[in-house]
């Protein structure tokens, strides 16, 4: 097998940075997919026997990304080490987020003392960072003062208690008032892009396969967790999750461990943010049941925004759209009544996402009106 091997669990960016630090530009490096090509494993082939007749080519390193495993058939996974050994004589092997069968193959094939397992260290939420987090929430998220205070209190508890188990916080309230934006803002403040899961976009069978792990080549919750860039995970519209799937979250929220068919994920010290449209904690408890609700460490209420806050959003979003337009179109909108109309009717909008869409449609209807008028005249 390889002279030495590193198994890395964590995001691709950090994995690539590690490989770049440890390899030289003039090294002969290959990917695992090149190994598959050399081994002539096609859509329905097994490992060819004549490979042993030719000595494997010596290479300095072999780099295997998590996505590579989705490009091969399932019979390749337990034969991972065998295929590589028969095609290349590898100096150092780097593998990101291998499925359990590949991990087992590597542990069995690598000589003792030549296999290192590296877990990416995600930034923790520390007390000294709470001021910066609160300042970012204040600047990026309008209103929701009580919700922000409850969130900071929950984060303080997470930092002070220093428990390895994950922290689970539920945001509840009407749609389009800043729940998802708050989660995104928090992830940026902690460091890294937010990992967002939307179960409302999945049918029951699709959600089942996503959670339990079906084919290794398909998207899965475990694979997305392994690839996360920050330790903040947003499960959007958790109230839309089929209650029959709740048991998949019990061990995750209790112990910080998630196991499916293909992966075993360490999620200790993670922060899970669950958004929902429940109008109260009582309604959430009734809908979710005591077993699921008791695993939520804190519930943060998001209320409807005030008129002044809605006007601020209107002005900011119109300015954002105008920044994308050329000078002529910008002048047309500035001279129109679009902005004044939305400010006058701000109170009627409860969902800010819907309001922004309406603003954009009003702007582009105004700009496209001459095209429609010209077309009608030519008929």
PLM regions: where:
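Walker A/P-loop
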Residues: 4-30, 165-197
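Canonical AAA+ ATPase core
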Residues: 90, 97-103, 217-221, 237-245, ...
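AAA+/P-loop NTPase substrate/partner-engagement loops
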Residues: 189-217
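Conserved AAA+ ATPase "sensor/coupling" helix adjacent to the nucleotide-binding pocket
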Residues: 110-114, 312-328
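N-terminal accessory segments that target, anchor, or regulate ATP-driven/P-loop NTPase machines
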Residues: 1-120
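A short helix-turn-beta junction within AAA+ P-loop NTPase domains corresponding to the substrate/partner-engaging
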Residues: 105-125, 192-194, 286-304
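Pre-Walker A (pre-P-loop) alpha-helix and adjacent loop at the N terminus of AAA/AAA+ ATPase modules
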Residues: 127-168, 361-367
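Conserved alpha-helical scaffold flanking the Walker A/P-loop in AAA+ ATPase domains
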Residues: 44-58, 212-237, 262-263
């Amino acid at each position: 097998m390889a002279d030495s091997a590193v198994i890395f669990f964590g995001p691709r960016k950090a994995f690539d940075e590690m490989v770049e630090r440890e390899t030289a530009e003039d090294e002969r490096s290959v990917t695992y997919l090149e190994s598959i090509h050399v081994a002539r494993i096609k859509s329905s082939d097994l490992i060819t026997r004549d490979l042993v007749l030719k000595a494997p080519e010596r290479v300095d390193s072999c780099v295997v990304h998590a996505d590579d495993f989705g490009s091969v058939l399932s019979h390749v996974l337990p034969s991972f080490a065998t295929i590589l050994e028969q095609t290349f004589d590898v100096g150092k092997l780097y593998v990101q987020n291998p499925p359990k069968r590949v991990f087992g193959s590597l542990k069995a094939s690598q000589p003792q003392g030549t296999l290192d397992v590296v877990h990416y260290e995600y930034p923790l939420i520390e007390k000294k960072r709470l001021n910066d987090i609160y300042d970012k929430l204040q600047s990026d998220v309008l209103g929701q003062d009580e919700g922000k205070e409850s969130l900071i209190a929950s984060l303080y508890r997470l930092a002070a208690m220093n428990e390895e188990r994950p922290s689970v916080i539920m945001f509840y309230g009407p749609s389009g008032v800043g729940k998802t934006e708050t989660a995104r803002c928090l992830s940026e403040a902690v460091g890294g892009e937010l990992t967002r899961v939307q179960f409302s976009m999945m049918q029951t069978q699709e959600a089942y396969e996503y959670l339990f792990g079906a084919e290794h080549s398909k998207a899965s919750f475990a694979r997305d967790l392994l690839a996360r860039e920050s330790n903040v995970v947003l499960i959007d519209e958790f109230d839309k999750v089929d209650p029959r799937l709740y048991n998949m979250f019990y061990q995750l929220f209790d112990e910080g461990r998630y196991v499916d068919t293909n992966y075993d994920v360490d999620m200790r010290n993670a922060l899970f943010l669950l958004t929902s449209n429940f109008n109260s904690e009582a309604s959430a408890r009734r809908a979710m049941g005591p077993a699921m609700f008791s695993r939520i460490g804190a519930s943060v209420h998001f209320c409807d925004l005030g008129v002044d806050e809605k006007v601020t959003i209107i002005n900011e979003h119109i300015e954002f759209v105008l920044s994308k337009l050329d000078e002529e179109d910008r002048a047309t909108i500035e001279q129109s009544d679009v902005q004044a109309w939305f400010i006058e009717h701000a109170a009627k909008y409860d969902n800010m996402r819907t309001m922004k869409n309406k603003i954009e449609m009003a702007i582009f209807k105004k700009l496209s009106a001459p095209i429609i008028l010209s077309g009608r005249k030519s008929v």
